[in-house]
Amino acid sequence: MALLSPRVPRLPLASASAAGAGLRCCVSGGRAGSAAWCHASAAGSVASSSSELEAIRWGTAKLQGARDEMEDEVVLRPGSLLDGFSFAAVFDGHAGFSAVEFLRDELYKECAAALDGGAVLSTKNLDAITDSIQRAFATVDANLSTWLEQMDKEDESGATATAMFLRNDVLVVSHIGDSCLQVVSRGGRPQAVTNFHRPYGNKKASLEEVKRIRAAGGWIVDGRICGEISVSRAFGDIRFKTRKNEMLVKGVKEGRWTEKFISRINFKGDLIVSSPDVSLVELGPDVEFVLLATDGLWDYIKSSEAVALVRDQLRQHGDVQVACEALGQIALDRRSQDNISIVIADLGRTNWKELPAQRPNLFLELTQAVATVGAVSLGIYISSLLALQ
């Protein structure tokens, strides 16, 4: 199948090797067969002295997958526009592309202004950074809601977002929704920097989302807020924010619930919020690369597998872009039904040719693939049981 350009051979996944060290993390906040769009870029040049910071090499990929439309987007601004920080973000749209289209241009600008051109990032003060980014996200969401209401009364699109500000020594991540970021040490062990904001599952983050939604007057059916949407933090989605009452009336007309049912509903807040979790990771010398992707990847590939694949690809040829495309190919081969967006930032510290070859464990790969799909279904089932209590 002509899924990627250039064509990437299908490679067996390799099991992850022993863990390394080198990072410290702080957290704040609460068809197959479709065309693919891929991009690559590099920031700077390789340092001539070991005391200098090496280059960050970037690879990005967007794959439409089985969806009729492409609602994902990748934004990459490498270089030193923000006091030496590069910016990268993935947006996962739903119910249309309007929200993503707005965010593609506006989120970076608002964050850059709130962060004082990157000066706040350089302080490494997590409280100050969190406050700035949360204000920026709130402003963007308010502006987006106004824009959606003025543009089309029927436009109820939304989008999740994971954005990172990366310098060779530090990483700042801001996140809402169900995209995910991984930070990897030289040993190849992934550390998740973000949590999924979903109204189902038995993890602490999911249970907190369920509690917040119920406190706001919402309910969850089959892992979906009001039986409609399976993500609990996002930009846009005005029917769960400024148009909640209109949503109730529309639901009665469509036969999804009754007048008696909505008479008992008392909304006390937004059911979907845009407040991001913000994390700061100081990057030690053993951190190899950063991997950022939408859930079209993570629902079908475990983080340990993704890390192992990227490391093996870079060991073979050192091409970040080809590694990015190969990772997307694996998700498509596993019948991912969603759009997929991927960003990889190689910090340029690793001599990939010196890494020993990793031996594939085909049995482990098969069982992990089955477990990944099963875990999603199990999480929805557990949340449905909790909703009935």
Swiss-Prot record:
GO terms for biological process: photosynthetic electron transport chain; photosystem stoichiometry adjustment; signal transduction. Binds 2 magnesium or manganese ions per subunit. The keyword Metal-binding applies. Residues 57-347 form the PPM-type phosphatase domain. Its EC number is 3.1.3.16. It is a single-pass membrane protein. Gene3D superfamilies: PPM-type phosphatase domain. InterPro entries: PP2C, PP2C_BS, PPM-type-like_dom_sf, PPM-type_phosphatase-like_dom. Keywords: Hydrolase, Magnesium, Manganese, Membrane, Metal-binding, Protein phosphatase, Transmembrane, Transmembrane helix. One of its GO terms (molecular function) is magnesium ion binding. It catalyses: O-phospho-L-seryl-[protein] + H2O = L-seryl-[protein] + phosphate; O-phospho-L-threonyl-[protein] + H2O = L-threonyl-[protein] + phosphate. It is an enzyme of class 3 (hydrolase). It is found in: Membrane. It comes from the Eukaryota. Mn(2+) 1 binds at residues 92-93. Belongs to the PP2C family. This is Probable protein phosphatase 2C 5. It comes from Oryza sativa subsp. japonica (Rice).
